[in-house]
């Protein structure tokens, strides 16, 4: 359709998957940090 070879398509899909995984990992890290901060505040209260 757009002249993309199967290898190019696979590489593009792999890059998109890697970006999605990084985004999910960043979100999980932020959530964990927030939960830890809340737990620390609750423990000190």
UniProtKB/Swiss-Prot annotation:
Residue positions where Blocked amino end (Met) is found in the record: 1
Which key words tag this protein in UniProt?
Answer: Antifreeze protein, Repeat
Q: Where are the sequence repeats?
A: 9-21, 22-33, 34-45
Q: Which family does it belong to?
A: Belongs to the type-I AFP family.
Q: What does this protein do?
A: Antifreeze proteins lower the blood freezing point.
* Identification of the protein by name: Ice-structuring protein SS-8
Specify the species. Myoxocephalus scorpius
Q: What is the lineage of its organism?
A: Eukaryota, Metazoa, Chordata, Craniata, Vertebrata
